[in-house]
């Protein structure tokens, strides 16, 4: 993917505008979007200080998979404050057992620098299942 950050950003913005109009998609004040895929059984929401265990599958808006705990077959645990802003915010809306698709604008992800396989200014999509909160 050799597109410029500006091109990625514009395509991401266009994607988010169209995506935001879809049924069930919620757009928050920050620009994060999410869609509940499966309701959870929990009642508590994680806070920014929580440690969570999740399964996730991350793609670019063109469907390219860049990271997936699902494909590795092993969930991941982390402190919420250690991850990108889109996850910090998105996971606070979730409860245990819930599956959500997060649509994360680049400014809430890796921004202009990108990261590894993630190009500059890329909008990211993550399917996240919240397994547990500690």
Residue ranges and their predicted role:
Residues 1-134:
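Cross-family detector of peptidyl-prolyl cis-trans isomerase
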């Amino acid at each position: 993917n050799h597109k410029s950050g500006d091109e990625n950003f514009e395509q991401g913005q266009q994607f988010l505008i169209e995506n935001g109009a879809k049924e069930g998609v919620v757009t928050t004040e920050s620009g994060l979007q999410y869609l509940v895929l499966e309701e959870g059984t929990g009642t508590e929401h994680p806070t920014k200080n929580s440690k969570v265990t999740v399964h996730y599958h991350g793609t670019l808006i063109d469907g390219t998979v860049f990271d997936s705990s699902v494909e590795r077959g092993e969930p991941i645990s982390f402190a919420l404050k250690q991850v990108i802003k889109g996850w910090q915010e998105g996971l606070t809306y979730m409860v245990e057992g819930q599956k959500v698709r997060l649509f994360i604008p680049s400014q809430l992800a890796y921004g202009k620098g990108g990261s590894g396989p993630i190009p500059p200014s890329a909008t990211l999509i993550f399917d996240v299942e919240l397994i547990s909160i500690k």
